[in-house]
Amino acid sequence: MFKSTDPQIKNEILKKTQSEFILAGHCGIPFYEELSEGIWFNTGVIGMPANDGQTSTWYLELTENQNFKPVYHKLSYDFELASNKMIQENLPSEYAKTLTTGVWDNCDVLPEREAKAQGQSLNI
């Protein structure tokens, strides 16, 4: 599920699950969207840059005090060390490179809008 996914699809899922909000992850690109049936939060993924050309990753903070308004934070870490350890452990070199460049080696899983935004800073 991505920001560009048809809002009707997200609304159908919210309605079907009888949820006020859905908190999802793993798509790799964080976003927040208020819809007619509820709110969709996507945290991104903590272990991989968001294909935005930045070596930092993202995480989402939600508290009741904020009335469940999202606060997205960048997480900086020693990406060179992490990349080198991945290489030492014979993990996929494409992922190790992504840690140092902030862009994914391919965009096959992305809808067109997100694929075209590769390397662009996120505004969330």
What residue spans do the PLM features occupy?
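Acidic, His/Gly-rich catalytic cores of divalent-metal-dependent hydrolytic chemistry
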Residues: E34-I124
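Conserved catalytic scaffold of divalent metal-dependent phosphoesterases
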Residues: M1-F21
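Active-site neighborhood of phospho(di)ester-bond hydrolases with catalytic His/Asp-centered motifs
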Residues: E20-G28, W40-G44
